[in-house]
Every structure is written in structure tokens, then in C-alpha cells.
């Protein structure tokens, strides 16, 4: 499971180094293979270990090509999907179209989301955190059925 936010750098060749604490689990459980695609609701990228991505592909396979929304979702997620492999230094290459989609520059944030990572431009991530905090403050959490019994 992936958790926590790590500030990392994008090198001049478009590579990022996955933090050391994640490398061994990715190598052992997923042979270092990751699928990167776009987040359809935010300007960030989603990085899935290969076995997690295969579960998503199985769901996408059931989508109808005649339903406009399903076809659009499938087109975006699969059209941008790139499989990459950790190199000997724990780095992966982010293809240019994906870097452009998420407006990634030198400083980026890798954010663990249990079964996947999000990859954000650092400034966009900070803005997203502010928006998340505002959303939480403005909501009546107890009225949300899924959050009613959530306590920290």
C-alpha cells in the first residue's frame, strides 16, 4: 500500500526516481512494471502497479463502444496509458504527452493513494490541498452516509 507525499524532481530527460521505500514492493510484487495514465478529473497523472492496472483494464473491457461516455472514458484512460519499468536506479520515464497533460515541470509531488500514486506539479498539488481542506470544512461530514462513522 502506498501512502504519503514525496517531493521529487523531474530530470532533463523526463525521468523521476521512485522513492526508495516503494522500490522493493514494486519490484517484488509487480516486477517493477507500472502503468501511467491521466486522471480524468484532475490535472495529474495516475501511476498503477501493473497488477492493479490489469484490474482496471478488465473493467474497461466491459465498457460499451457504442455508449459515448464509456467510449470517451476508455479512450482517455487507454489512449494515454503507458507501461514503464523501473530502471536499475529506480527511475521511470514519463512520456512527453503525459508530462504535458499534468503540466509537470522540475518539481513534482508523488502522492500515495493506497493502490496507486498520483503525480502532481508541486504548485498544483499545494492548490489541490487547499481545495480539499475547503471542501472538508464546508461539508457536513456526518450527513454523508459513507463518512458518518469515519473518525480519526
From Swiss-Prot:
PROSITE patterns: SPOVT_ABRB. Residues 5-52, 81-124 form the SpoVT-AbrB domain. The keyword Transcription applies. This is Transcriptional regulator MraZ. InterPro entries: MraZ, MraZ_C, MraZ_dom, MraZ_N, MraZ_sf, SpoVT-AbrB_dom, SpoVT-AbrB_sf. Signal peptide: none annotated. It is found in: Cytoplasm, Nucleoid. One of its GO terms (molecular function) is transcription cis-regulatory region binding. GO terms for cellular component: cytoplasm; nucleoid. The keyword Cytoplasm applies. It comes from Shewanella baltica (strain OS195). Belongs to the MraZ family. NCBIfam families: division/cell wall cluster transcriptional repressor MraZ. Gene3D superfamilies: Transcriptional regulator MraZ domain.
Amino acid at each position: 500500500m502506498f501512502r504519503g507525499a514525496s517531493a521529487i524532481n523531474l530530470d532533463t530527460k523526463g525521468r523521476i526516481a521512485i522513492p526508495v521505500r516503494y522500490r522493493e514492493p514494486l519490484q517484488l510484487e509487480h516486477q517493477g512494471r507500472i502503468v501511467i495514465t491521466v486522471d480524468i478529473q484532475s490535472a495529474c497523472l495516475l501511476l498503477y502497479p501493473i497488477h492493479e492496472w490489469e484490474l482496471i483494464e478488465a473493467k474497461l473491457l466491459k465498457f460499451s463502444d457504442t455508449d459515448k461516455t464509456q467510449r470517451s472514458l476508455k479512450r482517455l484512460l487507454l489512449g494515454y496509458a503507458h507501461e514503464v519499468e523501473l530502471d536499475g536506479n529506480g527511475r521511470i520515464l514519463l512520456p512527453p504527452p503525459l508530462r504535458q497533460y499534468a503540466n509537470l515541470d522540475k518539481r513534482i509531488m508523488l502522492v500515495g493513494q493506497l493502490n496507486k500514486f498520483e503525480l502532481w506539479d508541486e504548485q498544483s498539488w499545494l492548490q489541490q490541498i487547499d481545495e480539499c481542506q475547503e471542501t472538508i470544512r464546508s461539508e457536513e461530514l456526518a450527513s454523508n452516509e459513507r463518512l458518518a462513522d469515519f473518525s480519526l
